[in-house]
UniProtKB/Swiss-Prot annotation:
Protein name: Aspartate racemase
UniProt organism field: Thermococcus sp. (strain KS-8)
Keywords recorded for this protein, A-Z: Isomerase
Family from the record: Belongs to the aspartate/glutamate racemases family.
Organism phylogeny: Archaea, Methanobacteriati, Methanobacteriota, Thermococci, Thermococcales
Keyword Isomerase carried by entry: yes
GO molecular function: aspartate racemase activity
Record: residues binding substrate: 49-51, 85-87, 166
Residues the record marks as active site: 84, 195
PANTHER family from the UniProt entry: ASPARTATE-GLUTAMATE RACEMASE FAMILY (PTHR21198:SF7), GLUTAMATE RACEMASE (PTHR21198)
Catalytically driven reaction(s): L-aspartate = D-aspartate
Length: 232
């Protein structure tokens, strides 16, 4: 199969976008520069907050998402990935606006969890991802149940994401997320790092159950698609 150009629809947020690029580079079996896949990144931090819109108190991010996807297509991307879990609430709209495939981080993660044989997983994610049933739809159709934090702990997750990682305070983000994750792992067989900011600060060795990181999952899939090892 021919090699493909990866398109990254980024900016949600910029740190998560840079983190995904790094992971793709690290997961590529390269011995020289020329062995790496071509990657086009459109980093658009002007995309309105996805969670705010889903909760009914923010502007619509779809116009900027569609514009960004089309720019990647114009630049020659063969497929698109998004380092933002909540943005996958709009995956259908984005896909219908372009010809090339949108490879869903959510679906790829759900497949990985199914392959692991897990039947109940905890979810650390934004209010928008939870309310929008972004992971629920992908997992429940596979018979996998989801545990989410209680209202108080979910507030800590949102604080960790917005006042911690997105604001550049990684230490605060990590501290709050670990606190919630430790509670959630007691009633789960694994924990999904269901927000790219969570992926930035939590690592597999932090918990006694597996930490399923969608950023790793999509990075691995993107490399295989780009190098022609796998097909869509």
């Amino acid at each position: 199969m021919p090699e493909r150009v990866i398109g990254i629809l980024g900016g949600m947020g910029p740190l998560a976008t840079a983190d995904l690029f790094r992971r793709i580079v690290e997961k590529t079996p390269a011995k020289r520069d020329q062995d790496h896949p071509r990657i086009i990144i459109y980093n658009n931090p002007k995309i309105p907050d996805r969670t705010a819109f889903i909760l009914g108190n923010g502007p619509d991010p779809r116009p900027e998402l569609i514009t960004s996807a089309r720019k990647l297509e114009e630049c020659g991307a063969d497929f698109i990935i998004m380092p933002c879990n909540t943005a996958h609430f709009f995956a259908g709209t984005i896909q219908s606006s372009v010809i090339y495939p949108l490879v869903s981080m959510i679906e790829e993660t759900a497949k990985r969890i199914e392959e692991m044989g897990l039947r109940k997983v905890g979810l650390l994610a934004t209010d928008g991802t939870i309310k929008g049933m972004v992971y629920h739809r992908a997992l429940l159709k596979r018979g996998i149940h989801i545990a989410v934090p209680n209202k108080k702990d979910q507030g800590l997750v949102m604080k960790a994401i917005y006042e911690g990682v997105k604001a550049g305070n990684l230490e605060l983000g990590r501290e709050l997320l670990l606190k919630v994750a430790k509670k959630l792992e007691r009633r789960s067989e694994g924990i999904i790092a269901g927000c790219t900011e969570v992926s930035v600060v939590l690592k597999p060795g932090d918990l006694t159950v597996p930490l399923i990181d969608p950023m790793d999952v999509i990075a691995e899939r993107a490399v295989k698609l780009a190098l022609g090892v796998e097909d869509f």
